[in-house]
Amino acid sequence: MMACKGEIWLVNLNPSKKPNEMSKVRLVVVFQNNELNHSDYPTTIIIPLSISLVDDTEPLRMRITKRENLEKDSDIVVTQIRAIDNDRFMQKSASLSLKEMEKLKQLLNEVVS
């Protein structure tokens, strides 16, 4: 698996341990730095996407528009950031722009500050 920071991948988040954790096979944004992504490190930090759109929820969610193999507009659910095993990655779908990555970093900083 050679995911890069800012890429959107299809992953298998099943099984989830708690009802408030996002599960299913779904798209996620890779948020881990590329030094770790390109090493033998066994996990990757991701942020899940949802196609159940909720308006006016920044900094908890960030809307992105469809592109490449991302077939629908989606919300990045910033509060669901987590690490997953690299075996869960299935297929690359799209990428965020540099501007979108900067905004995502800013929103995550707001959530954890």
Would you name each region that the model predicts?
Residues 1, 66-113:
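C-terminal terminal-subdomain/extension
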